[in-house]
């Protein structure tokens, strides 16, 4: 349920942009833990709009508005079907709340399509699996050399690529697309708790040697896939 601050800002936006066909609310403003330090995210959709962005500050609250038209949004959502990464448009629409619309059937069809797209299985090949494993091992070797040389900055980036490629491998082979980070932990708890434990071990480690040990466990786990 929207609090009074959000409601007041949404009323001001409706008055400022009375001719917008459809307005969707998504993101943190739909959550009960929204605070005044959070943003308000909106989608303006209309036949004459194009892909764009409007940034506002209203009553000291940051408002971020995406703009687009129905036809292009439909294309974006269809293109996200089966993707491991970047199902962003589908996520925004599938989790949104309709604040206003003069095109009820069109927007409801788009939201339904977005929800279906989020459920599509991940498209990947055996070559993709080989490349993920290769990248994990390659960046692990680089990370080992970084530790030997005491190159902390290089280790940071190489370790990141180990974790990124490993996570993509685990998600794809368990038929999950890469969600927003805040939703990733819950998915990993279900599909691969041991992998999640190694990720958390890496983050909690206080020195490079312990972090490297966690990376090696991550790589070993991936090579078993």
Predicted feature descriptions by range:
Residues 7-11, 15-16, 75, 105-112, ...:
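Polar/charged alpha-helical tracts
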Residues 50, 56-68, 95-101, 172-179, ...:
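Short, exposed beta-strand "edge-strand" segments with a Pro/Gly-rich flavor and a Y/T-containing core
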Residues 20, 98, 152-153:
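A general structural signal for well-ordered secondary-structure junctions
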Residues 22-24, 109-110, 114, 166:
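Conserved short hydrophobic patches within well-ordered secondary structure
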Residues 1-38, 43-92:
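Metal-dependent nucleotidyltransferase catalytic core
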Residues 61-147:
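Conserved NTP/Mg2+-binding pocket subregion across the NTase superfamily
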Residues 118-225:
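Conserved nucleotidyltransferase catalytic core and NTase-mimicking acidic/glycine-rich helix/loop elements
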């Amino acid at each position: 349920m929207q609090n009074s601050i959000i409601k007041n800002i949404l009323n001001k936006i409706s008055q400022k942009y009375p001719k917008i066909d459809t307005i969707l609310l998504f993101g943190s403003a739909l959550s009960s833990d929204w605070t005044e330090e959070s943003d308000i995210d909106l989608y303006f959709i209309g036949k004459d709009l194009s892909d764009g962005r409007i940034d506002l500050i209203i009553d000291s609250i940051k408002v971020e508005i995406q703009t687009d038209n129905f036809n292009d949004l439909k294309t974006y959502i269809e293109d996200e079907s089966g993707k491991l990464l970047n199902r962003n448009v589908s996520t925004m629409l599938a989790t949104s709340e309709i604040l206003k619309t003069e095109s009820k059937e069109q927007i409801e069809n788009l939201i339904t399509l977005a929800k279906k797209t989020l459920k599509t299985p991940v498209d990947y090949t055996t070559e993709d699996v080989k490349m993920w494993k290769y990248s994990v091992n390659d960046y692990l070797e680089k990370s080992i050399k970084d530790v030997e040389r005491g190159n902390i900055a290089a280790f940071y980036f190489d370790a990141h690529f180990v974790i990124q490629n490993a996570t993509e491998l685990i998600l794809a082979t368990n038929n999950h697309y890469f969600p927003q980070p805040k939703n990733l932990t819950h998915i990993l708890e279900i599909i691969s708790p041991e992998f999640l434990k190694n990720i958390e071990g890496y983050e909690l480690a206080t020195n490079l040697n312990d972090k490297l040990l966690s990376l090696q466990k991550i790589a070993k786990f991936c090579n078993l896939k």
